[in-house]
Every structure is written in C-alpha cells, then in structure tokens.
Amino acid sequence: MTKLFIADLHLSESRPDLIQAFIHFLETEARTADELYILGDLFEFWIGDDEQSPLQQQITHALRTLANHGCQLFYSHGNRDFMIGKRFAQECGMTLLPPVYPCELAGEKALLLHGDQLCTDDEAYQRFRRITSWPWLQWIFLHLPLSRRVKIAQQIRQGSHKGKQQKSRSIMDVTPQSVITCFEQHKATLMIHGHTHRPQIHDVTLSSNQPARRIVLGDWDTDLWYLKIDDRDINLISQPINTAKN
C-alpha cells in the first residue's frame, strides 16, 4: 500500500504555476497511491465552503476525480484554511481528520498533524490560534458577506507577514519539548507534519531513551514536496515546480 503526504501548498489565484503543478501531481503521482493525506494549508486562505470561487471549484473537481479513481483522501486543517468544513470535504470525497491523528504507518504508531500546535514558544501565535478556534467566532465570520470575509482574510495575511518579519526563526519552529510531549502522550514513535516549511527527517530521543522520528514536509514554492510511504521505504521527495507541471 502506498501513502502520500503533502502540506503547505498555499494555493491562490496569484500562483497559477502552483495550481497547475498540484493538478498535475493529482493526475500522475497521486494516481498510483492508495491514500493521500493533505496536512493543512492547501490554500493560502479559506473564507468558507460557500465561496465557490473558480479556484475552489477547480481544486474540488481535481480532488473528486482522484477520489473517484480509488484513492482515499484525508485532510488535516492548517492555520490558513482551518475553516474548511464538511461541505467542501464531501464535495472532494475527503475525510476530515482531528488536529492530531494517531494511526499505524510502516509498522509504527504514528501521528499526523499540521504542526502549528507544536510551536509553543510563539506565544502570540498560540493566542491567535486559540481565539480563532472559538466556534462562536467562526460562526459569526462565516455569516458575514463574502466581500467582508475576503477583506478580513487579507488583513490577517498582511498582519501575519509583518509579524513573521519581526520574529526570530527559532521562535517560529517547533518547540523540542512540545514535540516530545506529543510523542509521549500518544505513545508514538513517528510524527509527520508541515507548517514550518523546513523539510527534514529528524531523529528524536524520548524521555525513556526510546528513538523516534519526526518528518517535516516542505512547502510548495519553487519546488514541490511530498512524503511517500510504501511497504518498503519512507522517502521525502522534492521536484522543481517548473518540471512538475509539464
């Protein structure tokens, strides 16, 4: 069985090259997989399942086509598209996952997550994350006119960009102790996440001296990144965007 994992594509109308590369990926590499896991931030922002923008419709069709081909699709919310709802998931043929999803991978107890919850040193972001997860606040936002939601999303993006420029790189990475705590709470030895845009396979030593691995998926920008797990290997793969879309 072949399983693929991607995250942090940040699709938007301003990057047609990424849209084309993603659709090509779904029509080629993903067609050979049994399962595809999207671990958050597929879109640059998400203002509601009811938007029905050309981009949303295009991606819905591409994902539904893959699902109809027999590939099971799973989605973990990111910090940019945390309001993706059941309607969009059903239209795509995707299953929505909880914030931390325990499963069995390559004979190991594994955890799948977006990864932003591990960046606990960034207290300002964690405060923002808690506030935006309030159900009543999401309900109010989703009942605003679409034009107003777009403006709010743009303001949040601009604020996020300015905030990142003022933060050190270390504070925006995962906190090592939070990683260990997450591993040990779930009794896992393998973790797969995105968010930090720092693709790497890390060896981790837990408190009991038990070895574990943390695999960080890369973001799609000049290169696309995906993790491939089959019965034999675990491979973190990258490919230039300009060749992936041809």
Swiss-Prot record:
Keyword Lipid metabolism belongs to the record: yes
- Disulfide bonds, which pairs? none
> Which residues does Mn(2+) 1 bind?
D8, H10, D41, H197
> Domain of life, per the record?
Bacteria
Alphabetized InterPro entries for the sequence: Calcineurin-like_PHP_ApaH, LpxH-like, Metallo-depent_PP-like, UDP-diacylglucosamine_Hdrlase
Reaction(s) catalyzed by this protein?
Answer: UDP-2-N,3-O-bis[(3R)-3-hydroxytetradecanoyl]-alpha-D-glucosamine + H2O = 2-N,3-O-bis[(3R)-3-hydroxytetradecanoyl]-alpha-D-glucosaminyl 1-phosphate + UMP + 2 H(+)
Entry function: Hydrolyzes the pyrophosphate bond of UDP-2,3-diacylglucosamine to yield 2,3-diacylglucosamine 1-phosphate (lipid X) and UMP by catalyzing the attack of water at the alpha-P atom. Involved in the biosynthesis of lipid A, a phosphorylated glycolipid that anchors the lipopolysaccharide to the outer membrane of the cell.
Name recorded for this polypeptide: UDP-2,3-diacylglucosamine hydrolase
This protein's species is Tolumonas auensis (strain DSM 9187 / NBRC 110442 / TA 4)
Provide the gene name from the record. Answer: lpxH
